[in-house]
A protein has these predicted regions:
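PLP-dependent aminotransferase-like
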Residues: 4-86, 90-92
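Nucleotide-sugar donor-binding loop of glycosyltransferases
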Residues: 18-20, 39, 95, 116-117, ...
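Active-site-proximal flexible loops/turns
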Residues: 46, 74, 100-102, 123, ...
Length: 141
C-alpha cells in the first residue's frame, strides 16, 4: 500500500474507518498522504452512508474499506455510488483479514485490493502480503 500511495501523488486526504489496523494510517503518514477517520456502523464496517455524504463534498482522493473480522462484504453498489460521485476517487479494498483469493481481475470499481500473509492471518508466512491494482498485479515479499 505504501508504494501505491507514494507513487500516485494523491493531493487530498483519504477516508479511513475508525477501526482500521494502525499499520494503515502509519503507511499513509510515511507516504505523505493525508487521511481522516470516519465512523463505523453496527456491522463494524465503514459507515457507507456517512462516507457517501463526506465524498459529496469533493475534498477526498479516496477511501479504504476494511472487511472487518475477515467478513467479505458485497460492496458493488456502494463502490458504484462512490464512483458515480467522483470517478477519479481511489477505492482501496482492504481484505487483509479475509481468506486470500487469487483472481485475474479486481472487483468492479476497486483500484487496489490488499491481502495480508502476516501474523495470525489465514495464510501466515510471518510477513508481508500482496496486492492487485488496476492493470497490474504486484507481489511483495
Amino acid at each position: 500500500m505504501y508504494n501505491y500511495l507514494s507513487g500516485n501523488h494523491f493531493d487530498k486526504p483519504f477516508l479511513l474507518p475508525a477501526n482500521v489496523c494502525p499499520v494503515v494510517p502509519l503507511s499513509f503518514m510515511k507516504a505523505g498522504v493525508g487521511f481522516e477517520f470516519i465512523d463505523i456502523d453496527e456491522s463494524h464496517a465503514m459507515s457507507t452512508e456517512k462516507c457517501l455524504t463526506a465524498i459529496e463534498a469533493g475534498k477526498y482522493s479516496g477511501l479504504v474499506f476494511v472487511h472487518a473480522y475477515g467478513k467479505k462484504y458485497d460492496n458493488k453498489e456502494f463502490y458504484r455510488a462512490v464512483k458515480s460521485l467522483d470517478p477519479n476517487l481511489c477505492i482501496i479494498d482492504d481484505c487483509c483479514l479475509c481468506i486470500p483469493e487469487l483472481v485475474d481481475s479486481l472487483p468492479e470499481n476497486v483500484d487496489l485490493c490488499l491481502y495480508s500473509t502476516g501474523y495470525a492471518k489465514f495464510i501466515e508466512l510471518s510477513y508481508g502480503g500482496y496486492a492487485s491494482f488496476r492493470g497490474y498485479e504486484v507481489v511483495d515479499y
